[in-house]
């Protein structure tokens, strides 16, 4: 199963707290928030992740890479794709842009 994780916004409301990284990479304890999301998705069989990234998206890609460093609890490897936005596309635009990686009839979208 696949999921598109929308992670391309500017995070202006959290800028004073998380100025050095994109909002999904905000640290919760020792890990970025998005790692917890990926883990929970993988627990439920969603192991093909598409990150829709824009602002500081390279930080997301540097952290998650191709997903090979992350394994679902059942041992399934996690696969990661990146749909970069050259300019902010908004929610629907980001989903459309990430759609080129969708290979299944049904998929999840998380914001």
Where are these regions (language model features)?
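Conserved N-terminal catalytic core of the sugar/cofactor nucleotidyltransferase
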Residues: 2-5, 13, 27, 31-111
């Amino acid at each position: 199963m696949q999921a598109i994780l929308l992670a391309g916004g500017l995070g202006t409301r959290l800028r004073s707290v998380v100025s050095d990284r994109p909002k999904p990479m905000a640290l919760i304890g020792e890990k970025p928030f998005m790692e917890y999301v990926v883990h929970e998705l993988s627990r439920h069989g969603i192991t093909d992740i598409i990150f829709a990234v824009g602002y500081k998206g390279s930080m997301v890609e540097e952290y998650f890479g191709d997903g090979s460093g992350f394994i679902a609890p059942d041992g399934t490897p996690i696969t990661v794709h990146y749909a970069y936005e050259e300019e902010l596309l908004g929610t629907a635009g980001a989903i459309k842009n990430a759609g080129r990686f969708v290979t299944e009839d049904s998929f999840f979208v998380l914001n």
